[in-house]
Amino acid sequence: KELKKYDVHIIGLDLKEDVIRKCNGLAEKYGYEKLHFLSGDIAEYEGVQKVDMVVTLHACDKATDYALAKAVEWDAQVILSVPCCQHELNDQIQNKLLSPVLKYGLLKERMSALLTDGIRAELLESKGYSTQILEFIDMEHTPKNLLIRAVKTGRSRSGEALKEMTDAIHGHLTLEKLLYPDGFDAKEGV
């Protein structure tokens, strides 16, 4: 079957076997021969070399970072990511200037979640993507309603302001380490 008159091949990954069985059953039931679901971790997935679009939906915590890094590795033209459970930065963030606010756990958690997604978007920009952060569904349906939309432009941006900020809050994401294994050079994108 074509999807909106496009000949597409879709691969879905999830760690939950029951979800994979159900999704493959639905794909078969409705005749989508080019839609396959596999049980596996995106960080270890090697089934393809080139991908046009990567979509993530509530990939918990660092799984979003691994998916975004894979998307960059695959030179995906479009990335649509709905992150979830941004705990990594919450455990790291420290800043004397912000300490009066960061002492409140709820505020620290929310600030960390928003900063995490902003940092992810900026890291994608440093790798040649134009990014936007959008609210894709009303808050009454789910509080996890942010979408990072990234479109490949090939024009990398400097990460100097990002590096200055992440150093100031003592927070560095897994995505940064995956995209820049030798260390984030803020001027690399220029």
Feature-to-residue mapping (PLM):
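Conserved beta-strand positions in the Rossmann-like core of class I SAM-dependent methyltransferases
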Residues: 9-11
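Class I S-adenosyl-L-methionine
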Residues: 13-190
